[in-house]
UniProtKB/Swiss-Prot annotation:
One of its GO terms (molecular function) is rRNA binding. It comes from Physcomitrium patens. Pfam families: Ribosomal_L20 (PF00453). It comes from the Eukaryota. The gene is rpl20. Belongs to the bacterial ribosomal protein bL20 family. One of its GO terms (cellular component) is ribonucleoprotein complex. The keyword 4Fe-4S does not apply. This is Large ribosomal subunit protein bL20c. Binds directly to 23S ribosomal RNA and is necessary for the in vitro assembly process of the 50S ribosomal subunit. It is not involved in the protein synthesizing functions of that subunit.
């Protein structure tokens, strides 16, 4: 049986792992086995947290809208219900930005809803 030299393939695979873990501390970026484990863990965490970020931002927007709505004397769920009934198409991100940066505009929207 002939000898198989697979240095290039193995080196390429290891290099990809070390590139992924280049900013990690200590053995997590120096030793292949621990770097491989930490790289897989980092990729799994980043995948999970991309969806978690969307969830967290939506919660933040709802909290901001609720606070601004209660300052105008209405609860969050009544506000959303009235927005749909009056066919005002503003998503939660835009409503939160308006509530945070332009309270006069938000008050105008509230008056439009309550008519």
């Amino acid at each position: 049986m002939t000898r198989v030299k697979r240095g290039y393939v193995a080196r390429k695979r290891r290099k990809n792992i070390f590139t992924l873990t280049s900013g990690f501390q200590g053995a997590h970026s120096k030793l292949f086995r621990t770097a491989n484990q930490q790289g897989m863990r980092a990729l799994a965490s980043s995948y999970r947290d991309r969806n978690r970020r969307k969830r967290d931002l939506r919660r933040l927007w709802i909290t901001r809208i609720n606070a601004a709505a209660r300052n105008n004397g209405i609860s969050y769920n009544k506000l959303i219900q009235n927005l749909y009934q009056n066919q005002i198409l503003l998503n939660r991100k835009m409503l939160a930005q308006i509530a945070l940066l332009d309270t006069n505009c938000f008050s105008t929207i509230m008056k439009k809803i309550n008519e």
